[in-house]
């Protein structure tokens, strides 16, 4: 039996990114992903904006509500997606847990801009027996999993040295690559601030930092999103070089070999 899903927040990641794209080729939003997966079905959505609600109703033939209480009084979801701006995550999570006990809460990243708040959210879900997942999806990509296998097998020898480019805030966007590198290289052991960088929005910064993981050291550098987008990771090993570019759509491994001339 398929699992019922409620989506809270019908912005870009909730519904908008792929709204006008071919559904056979493009799946970038929670709404489309859950609607197409055979093991899930959309129960409802929640958003303050009436226009967004109407689009959801017309596109997915499911109801949409202006407030969470109304949705939870009518539906008992197995999965609740929190796809609102970060500052509302904790408030919404607590309201969910006060009313129902879903199997899973899938929250957009970052969980919170405040570490203590994030820890409280995690503990609250543990206390209620609810699985809390944060949408750091890059480590689930087949290419990223293959890279991890290459590192685990020793094909990519460690320790590595690397650079990761990010923009739009270290917490908001850079954390995607921090999470990916934790997946590849193990837990963070230490970090050093190179340059504080500028403030991004109300709650984030774009520092340059050096992070030491269990299997190597990576320098995170902030790019300039207002001029162009650039998200990439390059790792050097004694056995070669791995490049992760275009947000993971291109991954290139170059192994070492003897040069017959030099």
Q: Which residues fall in each region the model found?
A:
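N-terminal Rossmann-like dinucleotide-binding module
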Residues: 1-59, 182
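Receiver (REC) domain switch-region micro-motif
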Residues: 45, 80, 105, 162
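Short acidic-hydrophobic, aromatic-tinged amphipathic segments that line or gate anion-handling sites
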Residues: 63-68
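Rossmann-like dinucleotide-binding domain that binds NAD(P)(H)
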Residues: 158-234, 247-248
């Amino acid at each position: 039996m398929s699992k019922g899903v409620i989506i809270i927040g019908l912005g870009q990641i909730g519904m908008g990114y792929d709204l006008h794209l071919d559904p056979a080729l493009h799946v970038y939003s929670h709404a489309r992903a859950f609607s197409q997966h055979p093991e899930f079905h959309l129960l409802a959505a929640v958003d303050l904006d009436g226009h967004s609600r109407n689009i959801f109703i017309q596109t997915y033939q499911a109801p949409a509500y202006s407030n969470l209480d109304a949705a939870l009084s009518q539906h008992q979801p197995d999965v609740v997606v929190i796809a609102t701006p970060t500052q509302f995550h904790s408030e919404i999570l607590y309201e969910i847990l006060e009313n129902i006990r879903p199997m899973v809460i899938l929250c957009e990243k970052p969980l919170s801009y405040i570490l203590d708040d994030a820890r409280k959210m995690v503990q609250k879900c543990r206390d209620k027996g609810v699985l809390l997942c944060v949408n750091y999806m890059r480590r689930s990509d087949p290419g990223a999993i293959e890279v991890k296998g290459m590192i685990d097998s020793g094909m990519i020898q460690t320790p590595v040295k690397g650079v990761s480019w990010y923009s739009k805030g270290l917490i908001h966007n850079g954390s995607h690559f921090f999470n990916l590198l934790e997946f590849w290289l193990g837990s963070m052991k230490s970090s050093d601030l190179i340059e504080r960088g500028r403030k991004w929005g109300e709650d984030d910064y774009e520092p340059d930092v050096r992070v030491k993981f269990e299997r190597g050291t990576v320098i995170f550098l902030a790019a300039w999103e207002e001029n162009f987008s650039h998200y990439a990771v390059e790792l050097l090993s004694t056995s070669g070089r791995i490049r992760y570019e275009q947000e993971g759509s291109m991954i290139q491994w170059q192994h070492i070999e003897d040069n017959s001339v030099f």
